[in-house]
Amino acid sequence: MNSPNQNTRPIVIALGGNALLQRGQPPEAEIQKANIHIAALAIAKIARHYPVVVTHGNGPQVGLLALQGECEKSCKPYPLDVLGAETEGMIGYLLEQELRNQLPGRDVVTLLTQIVVDRQDPAFLQPTKPIGPVYTLEQAQQLAQERGWAIAADGQGYRRVVASPEPKRIIELPTIQLLVKSGALVVCAGGGGIPVVVNEAGGLQGVEAVIDKDLAAALLAQNLQAQGLLLLTDVDGVYENWSTNYAHCFEQTTPKNLRRYRFAAGSMGPKVEAACRFVETTGQWCGIGKLDQALDIIDGKAGTVVMP
């Protein structure tokens, strides 16, 4: 088996949903394949030097599947946990294939991942997680009225938002640990993992939600004792006064400093919270920035690096 530094701790890389499907692009399979090819090139550069575990977003994809389900009148729409599992399989397959092509001889494994949430989490009463395509205000208002969706602003447009409870426990963690120890590059916890609760009989049961993939990545990185966490998105770092004339990028900062500011709940906010949690609990670093600058972020030459 060809793998780098098997005795060192991994870097956990979280790919934003926009790294897989850029804003404004139609959610077609060939377009996503092309974007995943680009993402795999960036991940492979890191994986040649470090052990790597990859997670990814699924917001556009799970939203598309939900829309398709709404259009099929012959059966009830599939619940969000099932749709999340479908996207985890699809995106994981495409990522694994591209990574195997980029890293000949390297074991690459995709693992469906269930993550326990609290059924009493207040997030179930206040949806914040954007999924699906971007709409104009007029389109969003019409869909909210027709389908009973919760809608919120996201960038220059509007998207459907769903419940996003806190990730508490990763069911497949022991298996992930074994795979990492073996030297495999693991793709797991895609889309934040499949949200489940423990029922009265002590078994697992899926719930209607989408876990934030950055918070899930932080929990995964903490549990794996990762040497670092890399949150990759379509902006080049964390900004104070974003989208104003006074915007300023934090190049190197601390959780204490970042917690002084407010960031958008559906986009940069979870990334900052994930970074702070990981750094505070482990004493390791977290980088936030653009996919094509991933190696430079690790080297402290790009993006925002959060340190203890």
From Swiss-Prot:
**Gene3D superfamilies named among the record's database cross-references:** Acetylglutamate kinase-like
What CDD domains does this protein's entry cite? Answer: AAK_CK
Q: Where do the coiled-coil regions begin and end?
A: none
Disulfide linkages recorded for this protein, renumbered to the chain, are: none
Q: What is its EC number?
A: 2.7.2.2
Which of UniProt's keywords are assigned here?
A: ATP-binding, Cytoplasm, Kinase, Nucleotide-binding, Transferase
UniProt-listed GO biological process terms: arginine metabolic process; proline biosynthetic process
Quote the protein name from its UniProt record: Carbamate kinase
Gene name, Swiss-Prot/TrEMBL: arcC
